[in-house]
Amino acid sequence: MKLNRKALVLAAALAAVGSFAFAQGSSESAGSKTTQAAGPVHVTLWYPATQTEVGPLPNDWAGYQIIKDKFNIELEAQTLPSGTQDQDVKIQAAAAADDLPDMFTAGREVWLRLANNGMLADVTDLYARMPNRTQLMFDEGAKKYTSLNGHNYGFATPAAVSRNEGLVIRKDWLDKLGLEVPKTTDDLLKVLHAFTYDDPDGNGKKDTYGYGAFVETNNYEAYPGRRLEPLMGAFGVEGTWNMTKANFGLQINKPEFYDFMVFMKQIIDDGVIDPNWMAYKKDDFRGAWKQGKFGCFREQNSALHSENNYAPFDANFPNGDIIVIDPVTGPSGKASVGPAVRNMRVWCISAKAAEQGKAEKIADLFEWMSYGEGYMLCGFGREGVEYTLDANGNPQSVPGDKGYNGPVGQTYIQLRNMAFNYTSDMELSSRYPSYTTKVSGKHMSSLETLHNMQGRKWTDAVGMESMPVPSTDLKTFYEQGLAEFFSGKRELTKDNWNAFVKQFNNMGGKAWEEEGRKYAEANGLLK
């Protein structure tokens, strides 16, 4: 049964402000309609930028004309905000206004709400139209990730290389202060204090902090989010869920979560975390460490050590040295960088686009991006302009700013996330080449950094990314409650904490946990 459009818009509006009226989505396949227009089909695309530090896809990108000639598509591409939370806000606002783009990417939580409200096209029949992409990316796990009631409402594609982040520290600051790499939470507190109060950069000013972060959450890394996971891991409460058979449940219900809260409050009260951490966006956070604002943080391999990303830090601090370290060990001997999941991005086709007969055109475009000409153009740019081929036929970035690793060339591969499957040696070696820094003359390799990060201690949590999500009201209560404890608005005592957790469970937390248990058991996710 097809939902009334006004009802869908109302449901999406409620979703954007925090209340969702879940409904049965349309079961009509997106592939059942065909485009009747004789002229070019206008397709709007919202994409996550491959590199947020450089500009959007340029207007003179060669792909626009190629796509028009090959598929009769007039593509209008617009970048999404760099942070996942800001992306969610933009997408939900568009849904509330019944103005979703034809194709866009969404996190699973937002995707699920849009799908349940009938705002997304049923794409089940479109896999057959994309044989190459389906073989490369859409295994049964990927299809299951976007399945509702036996139908698929999106394409789950690899979003990033797995375990590509780590806890990092300014080794030059450690050396200047005569400190060792911290091994335990006690060690870390001492190092963070010294980084804040002992002038590690030697400029005679009190302008540094020990730890840096920003709020980056998703359905498997609940508030305070990814940048604090190495600290949560020291207490065994990394990730939203504990996925073990013996101790399954929401981490917030574990006694150790309170221990983490006490530790985090100690860091905050001692003034050793950048006080802007709750306000920073991703770009603010990355700009801050490049300016030497803090000396310990969790970061992604490419954002840390790829040539264009590392260059500002190298220029500011030629003698600076940021190294990957083991996650610190907590009082009970636990340690983890965070939960390791199968990183997936859901590409969606809006229901309206399908009604207008655009779905098959979009599928053809998506398939073109997965191999041959489209893959090379989206992933590496133009041969002889952004890349050349080596003796083995592998792409290499052209030297200088215009190569695909340079600040100009990177703008031409902003759709790389639509092409890459993040598994082949060619992708990894070409994406993360070795180089020599321009100012300090150091040898650098973000691929070596990746392997270093992958070798650290992670918590295997495959499947956590597909677990049920809470209602918007419950999620808001959860996040605001923790923020109030961190800020001091609510005093962090055992009694106050227990009262908060009890209220959380009464509001729906316990029901959410039981829903998660049933899902995990049914899908064999418990270990």
Mark where each language-model region is.
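Secondary-structure transition/capping motifs at alpha-helix termini
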Residues: 1, 68-73, 97-98, 180, ...
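Conserved N-terminal structural module of periplasmic/extracytoplasmic solute-binding proteins
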Residues: 3-12, 20-187, 227, 232, ...
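Extracytoplasmic/periplasmic substrate-binding proteins
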Residues: 49-62, 175-181, 215-273, 303-341
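Secondary-structure capping and boundary motifs in well-ordered enzyme cores
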Residues: 59, 256, 289, 341, ...
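General small-molecule cofactor/ligand-binding pocket signal
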Residues: 74-80, 275-276, 323-325
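Helix-loop-helix "hinge/cap" segment bordering the ligand-binding cleft or interdomain interface
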Residues: 147-223, 241-288, 297-300, 348-361, ...
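Structured mid-domain segments that build the active-site/substrate or prosthetic-cofactor binding neighborhood
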Residues: 293-348, 355-407
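Conserved small-residue motifs centered on glycine
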Residues: 364-489
